[in-house]
């Protein structure tokens, strides 16, 4: 049975509170500020009646133990009436301080909640299996980091304000109205032009900070998208910590910009209210003037009318909070479902510094989740340390699937096993297994950083400039790097957009060269390149394959003629195997593919 909406909301709310409770000091301050705000609103309306009725009474009265003899109208005790503006200013100042405390604290809670949830979601992405990232829409993944988390914080803040402050205000005003009896009459409150000046200044500040927030948000989105696009490389090269730190920096910058906006909001609102209090104070002061005596109205009427007007906005807020709260709950549900997604299975405990590189597929069959047709069927081959096996075949035949299984990007074999140095790859820890493998694919992922840092990305520890230079030289990348104005320090742009395809490929080869892993996977590393680039890259790949166990997936058969063994894959099965010469002589499927490419 599915949980009822009420139970689901309760569960989500309790889980959301686990993010807020570490900041319970700020939460307490915000609630106290909201309570004081609501009480001051009610108290101010309550003071209107005694100020008017007692101050303007025809007969002597006693207020707070002080006798107020009056001769009628405006000639009543002027000391009391002169004190009224000071009381009003004091109350509104207290109200402004309470509003500042509550608004700033809630903004702090919201900004910290956004930052914490975004960081948690981002780091969870780094632990998710490739299968999850492949089947999800990248836009939805980014939206959960950027939009959903912000919706949660916004809804939480709005709900807290309405439930505490507006509820107390409404209850207080209703109590006053029922206490004084029901009356309704005119109401006009004119706010001076000074408020317009303040609003104009603050609006300009809001616009400026909003632009900065949009820029910071762009950094968050770009970093997230970059990680998602390069998810395999991040996992393969163990770059989770690097990506987490990179995201923390842009995430924290976004939080800082939001706090600048919060400060402007927190200051502007009490300033406007204090200015308004001076306007009201002037009205009360003017009431003590002789010319205003005959225009005075009853205190009860003024108090009830004031209570009615003061109650309108809180009621509107309370009617809106449910819709806002529901949007927040929906966003919470989406984010929590993501966080509840199981990370990559990492039950293996086998650790090794460096394997020999003996790789074996032992009658492996595999199907993708939800697919009835197997992607691989009874795949059986053996690669000795330092040898090269090439996989050829039409697109969709299962070649890249085999590469994904070696790195455990996909798991769940239907039968058989994959062994590395006679140990099942599922017995290795993920970190240990992937540290033995270097991956170079057709779709090169470069990060928005320098060439040197992109090459060093694959290295597990500190790397020297000399090591980077050596790797770039062996990859034949220095040929173009030396022509760049800043050499290795040249920024490559987002995903290497400032470099050509061949240049990006050579940086990827240098990255794998620096990693110095005993097992190498080349997945279409030279496809879709011009002849000149292919020659330079092929030289780099030849250096890279030296003394490494290599799995080469290729469409261009000229690049794998020297392989120790060539496997022809068709519909998930090995239909031919042998050396280039033997397969040509056999005149089978491989010879047919070769004939198609070279017409020989």
Curated annotation (Swiss-Prot):
Key words, A-Z: ATP-binding, Cell inner membrane, Cell membrane, Lipid transport, Membrane, Nucleotide-binding, Translocase, Transmembrane, Transmembrane helix, Transport
Enzyme class, first EC level, given as a word: translocase
Its EC number(s): 7.5.2.6
An example Gene Ontology molecular-function term: ABC-type oligopeptide transporter activity
Chief location of this protein within or outside the cell: membrane
Keyword Transmembrane helix applies: yes
Membrane-topology annotation of the record: Multi-pass membrane protein
Domain ABC transmembrane type-1: 29-327
Keyword Ribonucleoprotein: no
Binding-site list for ATP: 393-400
UniProt comment concerning the protein's domains: In MsbA the ATP-binding domain (NBD) and the transmembrane domain (TMD) are fused.
NCBIfam families on file: MsbA_lipidA
Subunit architecture: Homodimer.
Protein's UniProt name: ATP-dependent lipid A-core flippase
Organism, as annotated: Shewanella denitrificans (strain OS217 / ATCC BAA-1090 / DSM 15013)
Highest classification ranks of the organism: Bacteria, Pseudomonadati, Pseudomonadota, Gammaproteobacteria, Alteromonadales
Encoding gene (name): msbA
């Amino acid at each position: 049975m599915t949980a009822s909406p009420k139970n689901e909301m309760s569960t989500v709310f309790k889980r959301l509170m686990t993010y807020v409770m570490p900041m319970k000091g700020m939460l307490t301050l915000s609630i106290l500020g909201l309570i004081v705000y609501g009480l001051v609103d009610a108290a101010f309306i309550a003071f209107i009646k005694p100020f008017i009725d007692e101050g303007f009474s025809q007969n002597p009265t006693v207020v707070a133990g002080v006798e107020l003899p009056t001769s009628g109208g405006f000639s009543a005790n002027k000391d009391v009436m002169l004190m009224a503006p000071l009381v009003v200013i004091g109350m509104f100042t207290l109200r402004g301080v309470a509003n500042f405390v509550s608004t700033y604290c809630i903004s702090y809670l919201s900004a910290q909640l956004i930052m914490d949830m975004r960081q948690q979601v981002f780091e969870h992405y780094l632990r998710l299996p490739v299968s999850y990232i492949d089947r999800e829409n990248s836009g939805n993944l980014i939206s959960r980091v950027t939009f959903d988390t912000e919706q949660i914080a916004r809804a939480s803040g709005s709900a807290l304000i309405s439930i505490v402050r507006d509820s107390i205000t409404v209850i207080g005003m209703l109590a006053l109205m029922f206490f004084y009896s029901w009356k309704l009459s005119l109401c006009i409150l004119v706010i001076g032009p000074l408020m317009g000046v303040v609003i104009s200044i603050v609006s300009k500040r809001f616009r400026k900070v909003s632009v900065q927030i949009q820029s910071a948000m762009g950094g968050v989105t770009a970093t997230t998208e970059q990680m998602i696009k390069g998810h395999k490389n991040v996992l393969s090269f163990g770059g989770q910590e690097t990506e987490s730190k990179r995201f923390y920096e842009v995430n924290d910058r976004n939080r800082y910009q939001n706090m600048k906006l919060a400060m402007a909001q927190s200051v502007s609102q009490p300033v406007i209210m204090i200015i308004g209090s001076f306007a009201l104070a002037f009205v009360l002061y003017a009431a003590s003037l002789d010319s205003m005596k005959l225009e005075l109205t009853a205190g009860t009427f003024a108090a009830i009318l004031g209570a009615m007007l003061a109650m309108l906005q809180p009621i509107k807020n309370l009617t809106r909070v449910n819709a806002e709260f529901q949007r927040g709950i929906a966003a919470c549900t989406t984010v929590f479902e993501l966080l509840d997604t199981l990370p990559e299975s990492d039950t293996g405990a086998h650790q090794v510094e460096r394997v020999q590189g003996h790789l074996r597929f032992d009658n492996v069959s595999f199907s993708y989740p939800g697919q009835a047709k197997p992607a691989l069927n009874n795949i059986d081959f053996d690669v000795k340390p330092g040898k090269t096996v090439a996989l050829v075949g039409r697109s969709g035949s299962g070649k890249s699937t085999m590469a994904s299984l070696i790195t455990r990007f996909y798991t769940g074999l239907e039968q058989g096993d994959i062994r590395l140095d006679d140990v099942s790859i599922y017995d290795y820890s993920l970190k240990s297994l992937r540290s033995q493998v270097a991956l170079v694919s057709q779709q090169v992922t470069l990060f928005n950083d320098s060439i040197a840092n992109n090459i060093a990305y694959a290295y597990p520890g500190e790397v020297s400039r000399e090591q980077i230079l050596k790797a770039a030289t062996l990859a034949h990348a220095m040929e173009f790097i030396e022509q760049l104005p800043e050499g290795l320090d040249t920024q490559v742009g987002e995903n290497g957009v400032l470099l050509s395809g061949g240049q990006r490929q050579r940086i990827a080869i240098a990255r794998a060269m620096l990693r110095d892993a005993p097992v190498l996977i080349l997945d279409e590393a030279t496809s879709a390149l011009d002849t000149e680039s292919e020659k330079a890259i092929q030289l780099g790949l030849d250096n890279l394959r030296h003394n490494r166990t290599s799995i080469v997936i290729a469409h261009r058969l000229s690049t794998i003629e020297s392989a120790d063994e060539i496997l022809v894959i068709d519909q998930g099965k090995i239909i031919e195997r042998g050396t280039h010469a033997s397969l040509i002589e056999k005149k089978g499927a491989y010879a047919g593919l070769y004939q198609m490419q070279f017409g020989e």
